[in-house]
């Protein structure tokens, strides 16, 4: 099935050509209005597809080419990546059709099912304790060490994502129900509205870091120490590298243990520490309980003790 026939059948000009020009791709992302992380991932997905087309001498792809590309992906990347790349293609070709630029040749391509289990492992309480003790020992190194301990303690007891840590501002820390709470901008949210209760230790670690930094109230919570962008907001990639480096320092080095493992660790320990599944769901900021059972909107996040129970379990464990 050639492109001209496909285009004519779709009610588009028979001369329709594949819109791979940078300005067309930019228009797609402007239309999509996606979060920066999503745009970055979809950009990577489209670049990979465009490269595959070029390598195979394909100028105007058809649905048969999409099927061939799917087979190529399934043979070369992980199922989760296949799902991401095909999702990006489906959205892109839906847009090209809506804009009368090119037929929607990816509409019927299904992504492979991915397993329900997490692609990342969690630390044991003992390993988490070792990580925190190692991070705390760096406090004597000055500002960078104070930041390291504050980030590690926040992520292991509160379970925020790297992007949530990066987006956090000092002004997002407020009082609620008698204690300090950090409100983070969760996945798919336009503002910082998901509360993470700060344990006394996490609050003290953050205060110590901010005091040493001489931080102002309108600044990001965590800033870069790099000579290239010192004082600027710490990126999510930098947060991820920081935690991964800490793991390696502790002798904990596995492809399945990444910075996101701190979130799985906090969730696992919270569940094992006897917290109600509804509390754990709210603790993680899930929109529903598809991953943690049935969501209960009546649960009050700021009165939950998930963070404290996670910290207690970590510091009582041996390594």
Regions found by a protein language model. Give the residues of each.
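Conserved catalytic core of the tyrosine transesterase superfamily
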Residues: 1-319
């Amino acid at each position: 099935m050639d492109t001209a026939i496909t285009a004519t059948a779709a009610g588009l000009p028979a001369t329709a050509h594949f819109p791979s020009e940078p300005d067309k791709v930019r228009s797609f992302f402007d239309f999509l209005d996606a979060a920066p992380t999503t745009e970055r991932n979809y950009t990577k997905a489209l670049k990979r597809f465009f490269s595959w087309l070029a390598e195979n001498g394909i100028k105007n792809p058809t649905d048969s080419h999409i099927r061939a590309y799917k087979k190529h992906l399934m043979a070369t990347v992980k199922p989760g990546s296949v799902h991401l790349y095909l999702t990006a293609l489906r959205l892109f070709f839906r847009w090209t059709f809506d804009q009368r630029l090119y037929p929607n040749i990816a509409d019927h391509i299904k992504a492979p099912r991915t397993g329900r289990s997490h692609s990342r492992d969690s630390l044991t309480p003992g390993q988490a304790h070792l990580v925190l003790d190692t991070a705390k020992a760096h406090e004597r190194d000055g500002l960078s060490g104070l930041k390291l301990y504050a980030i590690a303690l926040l992520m292991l007891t509160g379970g925020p994502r790297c992007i949530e840590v990066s987006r956090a501002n000092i002004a997002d820390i407020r009082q609620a129900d008698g204690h300090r709470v950090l409100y983070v901008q969760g996945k798919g949210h336009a503002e910082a509205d998901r509360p993470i209760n700060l344990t006394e230790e996490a609050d003290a670690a953050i205060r110590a870091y901010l005091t040493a930094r001489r931080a102002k109230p309108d600044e990001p919570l965590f800033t870069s120490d790099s000579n290239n962008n010192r004082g600027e907001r710490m990126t999510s990639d930098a947060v991820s590298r920081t935690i991964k480096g800490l793991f390696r320092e502790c002798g904990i080095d596995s492809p399945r243990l990444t910075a996101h493992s701190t979130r799985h660790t906090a969730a696992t320990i919270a569940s094992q520490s006897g917290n109600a599944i509804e509390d754990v769901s709210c603790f993680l900021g899930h929109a529903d309980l598809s991953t943690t059972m049935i969501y209960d909107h009546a649960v009050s996040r700021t009165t939950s003790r998930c963070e404290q129970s996670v910290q207690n379990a970590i510091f009582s464990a041996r390594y």
